[in-house]
Amino acid sequence: MKSKFNFKKLVSVSAALFLIFNVISCQRDEDVAADDLPQEELTKITLSVKDIAAETTKEYSYIIGSGAPVIPLTDGKSYEVTVTFWNGSDNVTQEIRDAKDEHFLIFDFPKSTVNLTRLDDVTSTGELGKVGLKTKWDVVKVVGSSSPLLKLTLIHEPASASEAQNGTAWGSVSGGETDAEATFGLSN
């Protein structure tokens, strides 16, 4: 009986160590405290969309865990778009600017044709290129198929990044982790 008890104890300790190892390996590579913008702190992403010709600006906010707001765009028009990130009522976009060498935005328009130019100034241009906090959208065709959308992804610490178009996305990375992801519907 004594050997059975030791075997059970060995199995229990092994199972506990296995669980601890898996929990630790599922966390980010660095401490959350060391992360300049932990993904758990982002609650809202706002796009300020300025119709360049009409000089009118409207804001569209994606709130984490809620539905996708719809941004009306017109074929043939150009828009200047600014992205802001929020933690509750606190604008944390400056934290992304401060860590511009560690962040990159990908704009994916899978059911539309939109040409994107990054307009970031030196405050949001780092070693990886322009983060994408300020962009110009030249809309060719908003509704290329049903349910057009923009999938916006903020990547933290990519090994490399490219601002070029990659399929339907403007920007691509290798490595890194997703800090935030938002979906905005598009309409004409």
Region annotations inferred by a language model:
Residues 8-17:
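Sec-dependent N-terminal signal peptides
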Residues 49-74:
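N-terminal edge beta-strand
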Residues 74-78, 109-112, 140-150, 188:
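A short, structured loop/turn motif at beta-sheet edges
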Residues 165-188:
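Short beta-strand elements
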Residues 28, 92-130, 143:
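Extended, polar beta-sheet/loop recognition surfaces of beta-rich domains
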Residues 80, 85, 140-168:
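Internal, hydrophobic beta-strand segments that form the core of beta-sheet-rich folds
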Residues 2-5, 19-47:
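Bacterial Sec-dependent N-terminal signal peptides
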Residues 72-101:
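Short, well-structured hydrophobic secondary-structure segments
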